[in-house]
């Protein structure tokens, strides 16, 4: 872990007995989503690759900071390129790395959703075990509600989690799903008080970490096989649609 522990601006790492914790943040506070070269969008894909390559990791816990998982955009992190057209190739590459590298982590992942996950909640629900604080809620506010095509993987993830029709409704309307409803729908395993969330994640992590390393790795492989196949088939296409809609103004808006 020493080669990446202090490498990232938006992610803190700690590890005990093979259980790695990745804590997302923005300047030490709750994580916000931005598009700068030092944003979570830029860093997470690289971080997931570093984590995947570290054989000392037996379990990975992904969580946020304070009372929010990721609930808002970061206005202090604008993209550095002179225009959206100049930025989009980087954003597309980062988008591909973000979910593909998360799913390429070869050990089980636990998502500990410490508060609202309103932007890129798929990062949490793609984990093998999803725990949520009572105050957590899930939505996709970064795309259709904000005028963007939901093509960066959420178009694959949410219809898989919720079923085709409910998933499309969720993406089109910006529906917010609370923690208890998320558990009822099946994409959250346990709902806990915020103070009990990380201790429970660590308890589960320690329990799993006692299993043989190869058992964990091959179990993870079979559990995410279909997700990886779907991402391979659909992510590039979806990002292409998202970028096209951003770069080509609608009639009357040119």
PLM regions: where:
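CoA-thioester-processing core
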Residues: 98, 102, 117-171, 200, ...
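Conserved CoA-thioester-binding segment of acyl-CoA-metabolizing enzymes
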Residues: 1-63
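Glycine- (often His-adjacent) and acidic-residue-rich active-site loop
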Residues: 28, 36, 56, 63-97
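Catalytic-core regions built around general acid/base machinery
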Residues: 43, 47, 94-106
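Structural motif
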Residues: 89, 112-114
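Short, well-ordered beta-strand core segments
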Residues: 109, 116, 130-131, 191
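Terminal peptide-recognition signature
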Residues: 22, 44, 62, 108, ...
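Amphipathic alpha-helical segments at domain termini/boundaries
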Residues: 1-25, 173-210, 215-229, 254
């Amino acid at each position: 872990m020493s080669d990446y522990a202090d490498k990232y601006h938006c992610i803190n790492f700690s590890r005990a007995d093979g259980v790695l914790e990745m804590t997302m943040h923005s300047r030490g506070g709750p994580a916000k989503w931005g598009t700068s070269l030092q944003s979570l969008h830029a860093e997470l894909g690289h971080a997931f690759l570093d984590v995947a390559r570290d054989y000392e990791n037996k379990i990975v816990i992904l969580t946020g900071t304070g009372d929010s998982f990721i609930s808002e955009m970061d206005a202090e992190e604008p993209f550095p390129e002179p225009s959206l057209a100049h930025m989009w190739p980087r954003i597309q590459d980062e988008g591909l790395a973000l979910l593909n590298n998360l799913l390429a982590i070869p050990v089980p992942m636990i998502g500990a959703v410490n508060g609202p996950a309103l932007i890129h909640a798929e990062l949490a629900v793609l984990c093998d075990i999803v725990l949520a604080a009572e105050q957590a809620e899930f939505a996709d506010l970064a795309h259709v509600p904000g005028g963007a095509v939901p093509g960066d993987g959420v178009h694959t993830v949410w219809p898989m989690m919720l079923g085709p029709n409910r998933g499309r409704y969720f993406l089109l309307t910006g529906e917010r799903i609370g923690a208890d409803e998320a558990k009822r729908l099946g994409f959250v395993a346990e709902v806990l008080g915020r103070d009990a969330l990380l201790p429970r994640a660590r308890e589960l992590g320690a329990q799993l970490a006692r299993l043989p390393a190869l058992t964990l790795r091959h179990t993870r492989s079979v559990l995410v096989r279909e997700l990886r196949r779907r991402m391979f088939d659909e992510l590039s296409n979806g990002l292409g649609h998202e970028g096209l809609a951003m770069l080509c103004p609608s009639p009357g808006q040119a």
